[in-house]
């Protein structure tokens, strides 16, 4: 059985840890409000851009379609762009993203496809490297930036487009967390490159719209911007998901610390009471012996 001093020291240690987790919970809650607002504000822009893309793509024939829309003509080499966080202490967020990425990789490999990874964020590297060390093409470090934004999305998009133009992959899939709430962040996989062709969208109500200088020229400009917007949205969703998961994890840790403190306090009081009782018995026994 632990001594009273050991129990007292342990209670003090858990209380110190509880203060840290409580502080981290409050910081995450404050950051979450801003991150959630940024993620939600970016969604309408991405949706509207997708509508415009659908309208333009419906007016372009296959031969004149830009490469980013038409694709390479092959479907053999696939690249999984996996967006993880740079920091830990956010529950099972990163493990869920990695699990989704590995599931997509297994599905593609089972279909006879070649799979490579492009990793964004530090926390996904080690678990993916364990199973797919030779299939990691590149990684992009966002840990040096306090708040990754459009500049980072632009850099990632440019590198991916260059890789696509060089024939390093035929199809790129974006794997990232979608923020639902502080309790729910769903791993999502969307095709990024070539830009998915619309299915029955943008050809009806927009049929009378004429574009200048022309659909092909506008698409050449908008397609890279669409890729950058998708990556920017993924980074914003990642930030909101990270803060939500971190707030929830730290709240659980604070509650668990409180439960442990209560148990240790009861154990301490019982041990102290037993020690006092033992001392009293010894004193009484000594007095009777005299």
UniProtKB/Swiss-Prot annotation:
<keyword id="KW-0997">Cell inner membrane</keyword>
<dbReference type="InterPro" id="IPR000131">
    <property type="entry name" value="ATP_synth_F1_gsu"/>
</dbReference>
<keyword id="KW-0406">Ion transport</keyword>
<dbReference type="GO" id="GO:0045259">
    <property type="term" value="C:proton-transporting ATP synthase complex"/>
</dbReference>
<dbReference type="InterPro" id="IPR023632">
    <property type="entry name" value="ATP_synth_F1_gsu_CS"/>
</dbReference>
<dbReference type="GO" id="GO:0005886">
    <property type="term" value="C:plasma membrane"/>
</dbReference>
<keyword id="KW-0813">Transport</keyword>
<keyword id="KW-1003">Cell membrane</keyword>
<dbReference type="GO" id="GO:0046933">
    <property type="term" value="F:proton-transporting ATP synthase activity, rotational mechanism"/>
</dbReference>
<keyword id="KW-0375">Hydrogen ion transport</keyword>
<comment type="function">
    <text>Produces ATP from ADP in the presence of a proton gradient across the membrane. The gamma chain is believed to be important in regulating ATPase activity and the flow of protons through the CF(0) complex.</text>
</comment>
<protein>
    <recommendedName>
        <fullName>ATP synthase gamma chain</fullName>
    </recommendedName>
</protein>
<dbReference type="Pfam" id="PF00231">
    <property type="entry name" value="ATP-synt"/>
</dbReference>
<keyword id="KW-0066">ATP synthesis</keyword>
<dbReference type="GO" id="GO:0042777">
    <property type="term" value="P:proton motive force-driven plasma membrane ATP synthesis"/>
</dbReference>
<keyword id="KW-0472">Membrane</keyword>
<comment type="subunit">
    <text>F-type ATPases have 2 components, CF(1) - the catalytic core - and CF(0) - the membrane proton channel. CF(1) has five subunits: alpha(3), beta(3), gamma(1), delta(1), epsilon(1). CF(0) has three main subunits: a, b and c.</text>
</comment>
<dbReference type="InterPro" id="IPR035968">
    <property type="entry name" value="ATP_synth_F1_ATPase_gsu"/>
</dbReference>
<dbReference type="GO" id="GO:0005524">
    <property type="term" value="F:ATP binding"/>
</dbReference>
<keyword id="KW-0139">CF(1)</keyword>
<comment type="similarity">
    <text>Belongs to the ATPase gamma chain family.</text>
</comment>
């Amino acid at each position: 059985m632990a001594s009273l001093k050991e129990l007292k020291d342990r209670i003090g240690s858990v209380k110190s840890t509880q203060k840290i987790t409580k502080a981290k919970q409050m910081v995450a809650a404050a950051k979450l409000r801003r991150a959630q607002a940024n993620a939600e504000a970016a969604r309408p822009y991405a949706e509207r851009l997708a509508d415009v893309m659908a309208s333009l793509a419906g007016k372009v024939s296959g031969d004149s379609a830009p490469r980013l829309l038409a694709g390479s003509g092959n479907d053999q080499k696939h690249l999984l762009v996996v967006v993880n966080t740079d920091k830990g202490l956010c529950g099972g967020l990163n493990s869920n993203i990695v699990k989704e990425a590995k599931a997509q990789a297994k599905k593609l490999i089972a279909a006879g496809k070649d799979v490579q990874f492009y990793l964004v964020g530090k926390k996904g590297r080690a678990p993916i490297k364990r199973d797919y060390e030779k299939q990691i093409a590149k990684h992009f470090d966002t840990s040096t930036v306090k708040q990754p934004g459009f500049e980072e999305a632009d850099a990632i998009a440019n590198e991916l487009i260059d890789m696509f133009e060089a024939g390093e992959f035929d199809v790129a899939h974006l794997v990232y967390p979608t923020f639902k709430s502080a309790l729910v962040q769903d791993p999502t996989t969307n095709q990024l490159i070539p830009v998915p062709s619309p299915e029955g969208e943008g050809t009806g109500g927009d049929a009378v719209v004429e574009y200048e200088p022309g659909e092909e020229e506008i698409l050449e400009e908008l397609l890279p911007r669409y890729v950058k917007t998708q990556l920017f949205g993924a980074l914003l969703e990642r930030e909101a998901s990270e803060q939500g998961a971190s707030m929830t994890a730290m709240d659980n840790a604070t509650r668990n610390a409180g439960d442990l403190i209560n148990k240790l306090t009861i154990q301490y009081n019982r041990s102290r009471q037993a020690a006092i009782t033992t001392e009293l018995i010894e004193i009484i026994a000594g007095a009777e012996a005299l």
